[in-house]
């Protein structure tokens, strides 16, 4: 039976949910900064026969037989990742960014060691020392933030906390910070206290690969990233290092320390996305991502909304709604009703709970993949402000929804759906 089974015939409930999600992606504008649309080739690799193969270990050193072809797949992914980011070492097995990060902790630290990372409400990530995450539960996590007046990373605070707490590892990187990070300053601070420098570049990896955002690889001991977001690949993880002497520790931390068998279909999809990112048109795409973000930020600021740190130099922006006495939860709902998907997000010193928040985060990778240019991005920013200004007025929502549907029809995600 299973040899000729189809989801449509065998599981109509699941099939309908999948079809509905396809329609949602085609008919909504995606502005969640961590989401993107991967290519048909990436999806082809991820849906391949490779999903059937177990391959514990690494190329040439497996615990299972029949790995001669998946060895080729994984080595292609490794070699392309190293070429793309100028690294001496790459591990393509982490199932996700969080798994990559936990492997770094396992490789470089002992339980209870002190780490210094960006706080969640300043734009950091759960795995950078948040008290509800393994990084804050199993380790002594100290958190740095932003300069209140500018919204920029408070490097003086980073240095002061490093001198005071002597962390074994300093974490740089972010999930909601829109400016350029000074990797050299972080390196200098880490060296001053003998700490490892670990950079999580998950949000800007595609920009880094294209050379439109400074690379942390020459400065950090270890770099991790997801492979979706700006990199436009499958939902998965990657570890890089300029120091191949760390290879054994990192490899052992991934397998057997943190994971069992690698997902060979996902690794194949990563190999495809790395090849795509090595092409000239990928640089053009990333340049447009930043242009679109800047165009949106300009309109949003002109309409009276505050962007934390004063603007954007990458693909995202964090909009504070404190002055408008509006919650991120409300804004998320209103925009969603208009066909525009964003996410509520905490802002620095947010008085609201993480389930409510006082801000929204938006990003341009997905709309740029779709084909938006600066003028269209600016128009979209205006629609967002119209919805927020109206506080969810039904007529404004309906008018905006009609505009969204029109441009989505003009710029489909995948031509197969036409």
UniProtKB/Swiss-Prot annotation:
The record marks 228 as: Plays an important role in substrate specificity. GO terms for biological process: glycine biosynthetic process from serine; tetrahydrofolate interconversion. GO terms for molecular function: glycine hydroxymethyltransferase activity; pyridoxal phosphate binding. Pfam families: SHMT. InterPro entries: PyrdxlP-dep_Trfase (IPR015424), PyrdxlP-dep_Trfase_major (IPR015421), PyrdxlP-dep_Trfase_small (IPR015422), Ser_HO-MeTrfase (IPR001085), Ser_HO-MeTrfase-like (IPR049943), Ser_HO-MeTrfase_PLP_BS (IPR019798), SHMT-like_dom (IPR039429). CDD domains: SHMT. The modification N6-(pyridoxal phosphate)lysine is found at residue 229. Its cofactor is pyridoxal 5'-phosphate. Signal peptide: none annotated. It catalyses: (6R)-5,10-methylene-5,6,7,8-tetrahydrofolate + glycine + H2O = (6S)-5,6,7,8-tetrahydrofolate + L-serine. Keywords: Amino-acid biosynthesis, Cytoplasm, One-carbon metabolism, Pyridoxal phosphate, Transferase. It is found in: Cytoplasm. (6S)-5,6,7,8-tetrahydrofolate binds at residues 120, 124-126, 353-355. One of its GO terms (cellular component) is cytosol. Pathway: One-carbon metabolism; tetrahydrofolate interconversion; Amino-acid biosynthesis; glycine biosynthesis; glycine from L-serine: step 1/1. Its EC number is 2.1.2.1. It is an enzyme of class 2 (transferase). The keyword Cytoplasm applies. Homodimer. Catalyzes the reversible interconversion of serine and glycine with tetrahydrofolate (THF) serving as the one-carbon carrier. This reaction serves as the major source of one-carbon groups required for the biosynthesis of purines, thymidylate, methionine, and other important biomolecules. Also exhibits THF-independent aldolase activity toward beta-hydroxyamino acids, producing glycine and aldehydes, via a retro-aldol mechanism. Belongs to the SHMT family. This is Serine hydroxymethyltransferase.
